[in-house]
A protein has these predicted regions:
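Ankyrin repeat A-helix N-terminal signature
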Residues: 20-25, 53-59, 86-92, 119-125
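Ankyrin-repeat helical core positions
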Residues: 1-2, 22, 34-35, 55, ...
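Ankyrin-repeat-protein effector appendages
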Residues: 2-9, 102, 111-114, 119-164
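Ankyrin repeat structural motif
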Residues: 26-34, 59-67, 92-100, 126-133
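Alpha-helical adaptor scaffolds
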Residues: 45-48, 52-64, 68-69, 74, ...
Length: 164
């Protein structure tokens, strides 16, 4: 058995030691496992990664460590969720910003009609909404007017749904 196989050993749910350390915010353990060869992008049976576990529990320093080691910011779990969707849904602007700075795609559709922006609007996280709208506004420049109108309409619909 190789050293990597030992480090990336899995439990009955497909979780690795790296995922468990990320879930618990154990940044030192996360870094040691990564330096020892753990797969930063290993996925469990639900398609979740250590980065997703760290985000869900708002472990900012663990998130940054995983990003520093090349964690995939655009990976989608089996349910369709992405690290950015989880961060936007948590209301944590620091983690959301770190993901965007690392190349997370704010346009990824996680489930029909659901993006990180829609989740932030629905939950009333206005600072995250503004943060997510910036890259979208840049992407929309030069697109046909119909595309821009559809984006504006979707944003209004999500905002109205959030007020109900």
């Amino acid at each position: 058995m190789s050293r990597t196989q030992i480090i990336d050993g899995r439990d009955e749910n497909g979780n690795t030691d790296l995922m468990r350390a990320a879930l618990n915010g154990q940044s030192g353990t996360v870094k040691a496992l990564l330096l020892g060869g753990a797969d930063v992008n290993a996925r469990n049976h639900e398609g979740r990664t250590a980065l997703m576990f760290a985000i869900v529990n708002l472990h900012t320093s663990t998130v940054q460590t995983l990003l520093d080691f090349g964690a995939d910011v655009n990976v989608q779990a089996s349910c369709g969720c992405t690290p950015l969707l989880l961060a936007a849904g948590s209301g944590d602007i620091g983690i959301t910003r770190a993901l965007l700075n690392s190349g997370a795609d704010p346009e990824t559709i996680c489930r029909p009609g659901i993006t990180a922006l829609v989740v932030a609007i629905e939950r009333g996280y206005s600072a995250i909404v503004e943060l997510l709208k910036r890259p979208l506004a840049q992407a929309v420049q030069g697109k046909p007017k119909s595309f821009r109108s559809n984006l504006q309409s979707a944003t209004r619909t999500a905002a109205l749904a959030a007020t109900k």
